[in-house]
């Protein structure tokens, strides 16, 4: 590509902002775009986030400097969230006028139309648009302007997605920041272990904890940060990649500033060895975890989980020495006055923070107060998590003085009420129990059966019964797997298959004659409100199995307003998460245990690793209430249990008795 054409395809750099100081730091670093969240419906509710009032002057200032602002509304919407979310969209449109919103829930597609939102629609990585044909589908069906690609893709897969990208749609690629262990949109770990949903921005990061397997106690699921650093030069040759995204809405202004500056240098001066060296120095100074290229280079993939590396948030600067009464630190990096240190990991109840009072040279001695009475006596890790530099503070302060004063907004007395879809009128139909297997033999062919679609599952199944099977597609389809899966779909279709359960809304693109099909949206579509159901109906779905992490009130309210017949996962083995990675030190099909005594195991299916708890989801005790509410399909997920795993008898109600947070 010529230098001139490279400039014309120059990607924008998208910076995170979880508070005002970080927003202004992104402006100071000359970010092209900034994304931030509100205090509701954001996938990073642990960040401070913004009110509408705070966002108005910040957005005006950004626009005045030619910087675009996108608001993340990428949380799962529950049944009673629709009116509030719609009102929020109206307020954004009237007062903030962001350049676009980032969403995962299909209900927001309908709300954007109903409220007349004029900005762009971006599909979050939580939407799991993960294979090339899906790219074309989301543009055609929803008119989205940008898709955020999964972090797990390698460069060849990214190129395949770009090749399929239609005109008018841009792709966004993560280049730097925290890596979740689970595939985005396919992790229920935090919710299953305590009711705080990652899909609603309240993940407590159970993947960062210490787990025990055999005699090892390690952080088997805690990933390093993704850092493409110098490899981003490869992305410059792909014009469909419009945006380089930096993760970090929970990070402070120091991290935001230096990370943005580093990637601007790598984008604009990536061929200059001295400038590359400066950029890498900035990244090392940005207070992140150790970095990994992960899958980016398919010929040299890196495992993101390295149990001997420190993976606490912040920059590891050493371990506490001395006695419990007289602890001290010899820092691996020089510490400045005002630096904020965290002692211990965030999941350890005894962890604490201290502010450095004066400069400490590299290798010097910082005396610590004996504040950690409940901590272990040895090897307490210390992380530098925030830094207050005068130069950066001055830049932020100067920008803060430029913030325009905004007039007091007189609220419109009208309240937004979401328009509900017409109900399906099929709530009194036949009730079905659907048992879903990995493989089916003759002994299992009683009642209605489902089968996960795979080579092994199809091989030994008599073709004469293929018409009776409910065929389940995987929760994730990677670019390399698309053609193989399409071949399997075509094979069973040619032998009379009619009923399919799709586990991402865009999987309809694998079928040609939708009207002849009985397609159901599966539970991994993460459907929890009637406007999302309305969107599914417009895509040709005949029914939907709702997300199983809801509480009793939400479950029972859905069928009465649904435009589609509804199903529910009544019992079975529901995964904590699905991942593309596995620690080299963790055995599959062998139990591991959390600090609280919860056990689980990992099993590989096709391209992915499924993490299962060692107790089943079981809502059977509430079946009558669910039938009365209008559910007509009751799903039982039956996984093969490894020999080394023993299931526990537990109630298995998940969030039934809780209100999902």
Where are these regions (language model features)?
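Active-site pocket-lining/capping segments in soluble small-molecule metabolic enzymes
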Residues: 2-137, 148-243, 250-535, 539-661
């Amino acid at each position: 590509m010529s230098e001139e054409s490279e400039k014309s395809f120059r990607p924008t750099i998208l910076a995170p902002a979880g508070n005002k100081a970080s927003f202004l730091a992104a402006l100071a670093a000359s970010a092209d775009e900034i994304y931030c969240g509100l205090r509701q419906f954001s996938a990073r509710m642990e960040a401070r986030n913004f009110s509408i009032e705070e966002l108005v002057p910040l957005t005006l200032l950004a626009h005045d400097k030619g910087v675009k602002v996108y608001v993340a509304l990428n949380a799962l919407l529950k049944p009673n969230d629709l009116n509030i979310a719609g009102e929020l969209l109206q307020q954004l449109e009237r007062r903030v006028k962001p350049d676009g919103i980032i969403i995962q829930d299909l209900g927001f597609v309908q709300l954007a139309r109903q409220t007349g939102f004029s900005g762009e629609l971006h599909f979050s990585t939580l939407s799991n648009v993960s294979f090339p044909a899906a790219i074309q589908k989301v543009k055609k069906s929803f008119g989205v302007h940008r898709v955020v690609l999964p972090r797990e893709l390698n460069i060849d897969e990214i190129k395949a997605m770009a090749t399929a990208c239609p005109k008018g749609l841009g792709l966004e690629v993560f280049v730097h920041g925290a890596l979740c262990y689970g595939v985005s949109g396919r992790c229920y770990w935090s919710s299953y272990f305590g009711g705080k949903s990652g899909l609603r921005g309240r993940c407590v990061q159970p993947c960062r904890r210490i787990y025990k397997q055999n005699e090892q106690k390690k952080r088997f699921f805690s990933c390093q940060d993704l850092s493409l650093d110098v490899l981003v030069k490869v992305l410059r040759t792909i014009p469909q990649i419009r945006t380089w995204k930096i993760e970090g809405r929970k990070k402070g202004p120091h991290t935001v500033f230096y990370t943005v500056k580093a990637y601007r240098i790598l984008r604009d001066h990536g061929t200059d060895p001295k400038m590359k060296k400066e950029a890498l120095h900035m990244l090392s100074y940005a207070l992140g975890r150790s970095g990994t290229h992960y899958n980016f280079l398919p010929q040299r993939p890196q495992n993101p989980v390295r149990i001997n590396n420190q993976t606490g948030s912040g920059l590891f600067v050493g371990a506490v020495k001395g006695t419990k009464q007289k602890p001290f630190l010899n820092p691996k990096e020089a510490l400045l006055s005002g630096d904020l240190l965290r002692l211990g990991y965030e999941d350890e109840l005894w962890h604490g923070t201290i502010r450095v009072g004066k400069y400490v040279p590299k290798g010097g001695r910082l005396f610590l107060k004996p504040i950690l009475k409940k901590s272990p006596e040895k090897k307490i890790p210390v992380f530098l998590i925030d830094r207050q530099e005068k130069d950066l503070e001055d830049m932020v302060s100067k920008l803060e003085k430029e913030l325009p004063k905004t007039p007091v907004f007189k609220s419109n007395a009208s309240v937004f009420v979401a328009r509900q879809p017409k109900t399906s009128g099929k709530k009194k139909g036949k009730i079905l129990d659907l048992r879903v297997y990995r493989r089916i033999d003759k002994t299992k062919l009683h009642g209605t059966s489902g089968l996960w679609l795979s080579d092994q599952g199809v091989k030994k199944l008599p073709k004469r019964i293929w018409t009776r099977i409910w065929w389940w597609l995987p929760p994730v389809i990677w670019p390399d797997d698309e053609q193989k899966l399409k071949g399997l779909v075509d094979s069973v279709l040619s032998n009379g298959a009619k009923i399919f359960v799709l586990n991402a809304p865009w999987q309809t693109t694998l079928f040609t004659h939708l009207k002849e099909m009985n397609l159901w949206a599966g539970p991994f579509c993460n459907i929890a409100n009637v406007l999302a159901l309305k969107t599914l109906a417009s895509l040709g779905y005949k029914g939907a199995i709702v997300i199983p992490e809801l509480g009793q009130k939400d479950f029972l309210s859905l069928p009465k307003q649904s435009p589609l017949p509804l199903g529910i996962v009544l019992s079975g083995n529901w995964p904590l998460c699905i991942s593309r990675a596995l620690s080299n030190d963790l055995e599959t099909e062998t139990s591991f245990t959390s600090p609280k005594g919860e056990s689980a195991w990992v099993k590989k299916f096709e391209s992915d690793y499924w993490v299962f708890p060692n107790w089943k989801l079981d809502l059977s005790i509430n079946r009558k209430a669910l039938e009365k509410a209008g559910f007509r399909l009751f799903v039982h997920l039956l996984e093969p249990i490894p020999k080394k795993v023993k299931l526990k008898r537990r109630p298995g109600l998940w969030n039934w008795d809780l209100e999902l947070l």
